[in-house]
């Protein structure tokens, strides 16, 4: 820790306080995340340190770089590259009655998918994607923060400040208590974020797990074994759930064209193996008119 100096507190992350800091000798500005864990008496589990150290290998223009993992007494500090703006703040800053430029929506979504595909190829899930951990710079680049932390530290029900962790972007298989889930959970979250990029409003904003599920069901219909094999045997599925018919996604997400709505629907398919993958989504016709050569990952993809 002696290599870094804290400048100011910049927020409360899922796992602890986040500071803006500076590397003493290079002057590089960084984000310093102090990890507080439930079982702090025993210190940080070595498994968590191992897991999180592996994340230093995730080097991609659309993934926030983990620069260093430091221990101080029983505290763990994660040192990340610094970006000053997140997607939630940016969406909140757009004046009432105005919306994000449709081409920027497309560019951001494509870049998010690039980052997710990169991590998924390396068998790293996010599990907690939301606008607050999508960071943006002033050049149109968007980066995913906190990739892999859920596996290292778990996803807490509450932030350490007792603020409830948002459920708005959580996939239905997670909400229904599936013991096994995989990369499709991140695609679902990205779909809900896609809708929010277009409308500035969360697509499904539940205030409890059951309210969250019912908001999804009201729009997409209550799932059963016909549309999602074995859903009825998931731990938190109840046969007493109200049986809603499928509603209209297009009436809720008015700012997307036909291709955009088609891609969104494919990202919000109930049955996880049938849900479009990040890689497949990147080849969807919605992106045909996006100039991918200007995107930050173009150089590594040989676009």
Curated annotation (Swiss-Prot):
<keyword id="KW-0498">Mitosis</keyword>
<dbReference type="GO" id="GO:0005634">
    <property type="term" value="C:nucleus"/>
</dbReference>
<dbReference type="GO" id="GO:0000086">
    <property type="term" value="P:G2/M transition of mitotic cell cycle"/>
</dbReference>
<feature type="modified residue" description="Phosphotyrosine; by wee1 and wee2">
    <location>
        <position position="15"/>
    </location>
</feature>
<dbReference type="InterPro" id="IPR017441">
    <property type="entry name" value="Protein_kinase_ATP_BS"/>
</dbReference>
<keyword id="KW-0597">Phosphoprotein</keyword>
<feature type="binding site">
    <location>
        <begin position="10"/>
        <end position="18"/>
    </location>
    <ligand>
        <name>ATP</name>
    </ligand>
</feature>
<dbReference type="GO" id="GO:0051301">
    <property type="term" value="P:cell division"/>
</dbReference>
<dbReference type="InterPro" id="IPR008271">
    <property type="entry name" value="Ser/Thr_kinase_AS"/>
</dbReference>
<dbReference type="GO" id="GO:0106310">
    <property type="term" value="F:protein serine kinase activity"/>
</dbReference>
<dbReference type="GO" id="GO:0005813">
    <property type="term" value="C:centrosome"/>
</dbReference>
<comment type="subunit">
    <text>Forms a stable but non-covalent complex with cyclin B in mature oocytes.</text>
</comment>
<dbReference type="GO" id="GO:0005737">
    <property type="term" value="C:cytoplasm"/>
</dbReference>
<keyword id="KW-0206">Cytoskeleton</keyword>
<comment type="function">
    <text>Plays a key role in the control of the eukaryotic cell cycle by modulating the centrosome cycle as well as mitotic onset; promotes G2-M transition via association with multiple interphase cyclins. During G2 and early mitosis, CDC25A/B/C-mediated dephosphorylation activates CDK1/cyclin complexes which phosphorylate several substrates that trigger at least centrosome separation, Golgi dynamics, nuclear envelope breakdown and chromosome condensation.</text>
</comment>
<feature type="active site" description="Proton acceptor">
    <location>
        <position position="128"/>
    </location>
</feature>
<feature type="modified residue" description="Phosphothreonine; by cak">
    <location>
        <position position="161"/>
    </location>
</feature>
<feature type="binding site">
    <location>
        <position position="33"/>
    </location>
    <ligand>
        <name>ATP</name>
    </ligand>
</feature>
<protein>
    <recommendedName>
        <fullName>Cyclin-dependent kinase 1</fullName>
        <ecNumber>2.7.11.22</ecNumber>
        <ecNumber>2.7.11.23</ecNumber>
    </recommendedName>
</protein>
<keyword id="KW-0539">Nucleus</keyword>
<dbReference type="InterPro" id="IPR050108">
    <property type="entry name" value="CDK"/>
</dbReference>
<dbReference type="Pfam" id="PF00069">
    <property type="entry name" value="Pkinase"/>
</dbReference>
<dbReference type="GO" id="GO:0005524">
    <property type="term" value="F:ATP binding"/>
</dbReference>
<feature type="domain" description="Protein kinase">
    <location>
        <begin position="4"/>
        <end position="287"/>
    </location>
</feature>
<dbReference type="InterPro" id="IPR000719">
    <property type="entry name" value="Prot_kinase_dom"/>
</dbReference>
<dbReference type="GO" id="GO:0008353">
    <property type="term" value="F:RNA polymerase II CTD heptapeptide repeat kinase activity"/>
</dbReference>
<keyword id="KW-0131">Cell cycle</keyword>
<keyword id="KW-0067">ATP-binding</keyword>
<dbReference type="GO" id="GO:0007095">
    <property type="term" value="P:mitotic G2 DNA damage checkpoint signaling"/>
</dbReference>
<dbReference type="GO" id="GO:0004693">
    <property type="term" value="F:cyclin-dependent protein serine/threonine kinase activity"/>
</dbReference>
<dbReference type="InterPro" id="IPR011009">
    <property type="entry name" value="Kinase-like_dom_sf"/>
</dbReference>
<keyword id="KW-0132">Cell division</keyword>
<keyword id="KW-0547">Nucleotide-binding</keyword>
<keyword id="KW-0808">Transferase</keyword>
<feature type="modified residue" description="Phosphothreonine">
    <location>
        <position position="14"/>
    </location>
</feature>
<keyword id="KW-0723">Serine/threonine-protein kinase</keyword>
<comment type="similarity">
    <text>Belongs to the protein kinase superfamily. CMGC Ser/Thr protein kinase family. CDC2/CDKX subfamily.</text>
</comment>
<keyword id="KW-0963">Cytoplasm</keyword>
<keyword id="KW-0418">Kinase</keyword>
């Amino acid at each position: 820790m002696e290599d870094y100096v804290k400048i100011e507190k910049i927020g409360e992350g899922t796992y602890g306080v986040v500071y803006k800091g500076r590397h003493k000798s290079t002057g590089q500005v960084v984000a310093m995340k102090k990890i507080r864990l439930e079982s702090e008496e025993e210190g940080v589990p070595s498994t968590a340190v191992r897991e999180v150290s592996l994340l230093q290998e995730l080097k991609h223009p659309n993934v926030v770089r983990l620069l260093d993992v430091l221990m101080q007494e029983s505290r763990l500090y994660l040192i990340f590259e610094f970006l000053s703006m997140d997607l939630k703040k940016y969406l909140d800053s757009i004046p009432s009655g105005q919306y994000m430029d449709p081409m920027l929506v497309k560019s951001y979504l494509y870049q998010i998918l690039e980052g997710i595909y990169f991590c998924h190829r390396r068998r790293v899930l996010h599990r907690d994607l939301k606008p607050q951990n999508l960071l943006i710079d002033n050049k149109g680049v968007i980066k995913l923060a906190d990739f892999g932390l859920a596996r290292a530290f778990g996803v807490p029900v509450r932030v350490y400040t007792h603020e409830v962790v948002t459920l708005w972007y959580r996939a239905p298989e997670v909400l229904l208590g599936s013991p096994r889930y995989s990369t499709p959970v991140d695609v679902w979250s990205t779909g809900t974020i896609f809708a929010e990029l277009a409308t500035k409003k969360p697509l499904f904003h539940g205030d409890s797990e059951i309210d969250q599920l019912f908001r999804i069901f009201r729009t997409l219909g209550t799932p059963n074994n016909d549309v999602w094999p074995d859903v009825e045997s998931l731990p938190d599925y109840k046969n007493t759930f109200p049986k809603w018919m499928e509603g209209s996604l297009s009436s809720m997400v008015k700012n997307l064209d036909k291709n955009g709505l088609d891609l969104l629907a494919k990202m919000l398919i109930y049955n996880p193996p049938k849900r479009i993958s990040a890689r497949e989504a990147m080849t969807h016709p919605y992106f045909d008119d996006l100039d991918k050569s200007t995107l930050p990952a173009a150089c590594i993809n040989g676009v």
